[in-house]
Amino acid sequence: MARSVKKGPFCDAHLLKKVEAAAASRDKKPIKTWSRRSTILPDFIGLTIAVHNGRQHVPVYISENMVGHKLGEFALTRTFKGHAADKKAKK
């Protein structure tokens, strides 16, 4: 179920503080966050945010078409190694 328009987009307060500080200082260093649930706002465009995927921080460069999505969508948590090969098909 989608979030109500009346409530507006959700973004953690500590992440907003870090983004505002980075924008004010024009700092290009990645902003490290564990907040995968935060919505990407227009203020984030042009910044690199390191989103935690459970094991490490994945750097995500925010572009204009990412606005409205969640940060966690761009830092995958699972790695698919592929299915086991069928030995009969190799012959």
From Swiss-Prot:
Q: Name one GO cellular component term.
A: small ribosomal subunit
The Gene Ontology biological process annotation of the record reads: ribosomal small subunit assembly; translation
| Superkingdom, taxonomy of origin | Bacteria
> Pfam families recorded for this chain?
Ribosomal_S19 (PF00203)
Which InterPro entries does UniProt cross-reference here?
Ribosomal_uS19 (IPR002222), Ribosomal_uS19_bac-type (IPR005732), Ribosomal_uS19_CS (IPR020934), Ribosomal_uS19_SF (IPR023575)
UniProt keyword terms in alphabetical order: Ribonucleoprotein, Ribosomal protein, RNA-binding, rRNA-binding
> Residues of the signal sequence?
none
GO MF terms listed in the record are: rRNA binding; structural constituent of ribosome
Recorded hits in HAMAP family, A to Z, give: Ribosomal_uS19
* Job of this protein: Protein S19 forms a complex with S13 that binds strongly to the 16S ribosomal RNA.
Q: Which family does it belong to?
A: Belongs to the universal ribosomal protein uS19 family.
- What name does the UniProt record give this protein? Small ribosomal subunit protein uS19
